Amino acid sequence: MAKGKDVRIRVILECISCVRKGTNKESTGISRYSTQKNRHNTPGQLELRKFCRYCRKHTTHNEIKK
């Protein structure tokens, strides 16, 4: 078996609603989740619906660059 890049990589998911709002008086931060993805099965950016504690609802979280 060839030794190479790891198949599973760590990614960070960020709430797109908080990012669009920018600095809002109600929102005190930006929701981020840390997870892993399989590089072979998901070559594109990961997009999941997760709970944002700052928006207080389920929103779309996209993968961001480190």
From Swiss-Prot:
GO molecular function, one term: structural constituent of ribosome
Alphabetized UniProt keyword annotations: Chloroplast, Plastid, Ribonucleoprotein, Ribosomal protein
Annotated GO CC locations: chloroplast; ribonucleoprotein complex; ribosome
SUPFAM superfamilies named in the record: Zn-binding ribosomal proteins (SSF57829)
Pfam families: Ribosomal_L33
InterPro entries for the chain: Ribosomal_bL33, Ribosomal_bL33_CS, Ribosomal_bL33_sf, Ribosomal_zn-bd
Localization: Plastid, Chloroplast
Keyword rRNA-binding: no
Database matches in Gene3D superfamilies: Ribosomal protein L33 (2.20.28.120)
Record-level GO BP terms: translation
Family according to the record: Belongs to the bacterial ribosomal protein bL33 family.
Name this protein carries in UniProt: Large ribosomal subunit protein bL33c
Organism: Zea mays
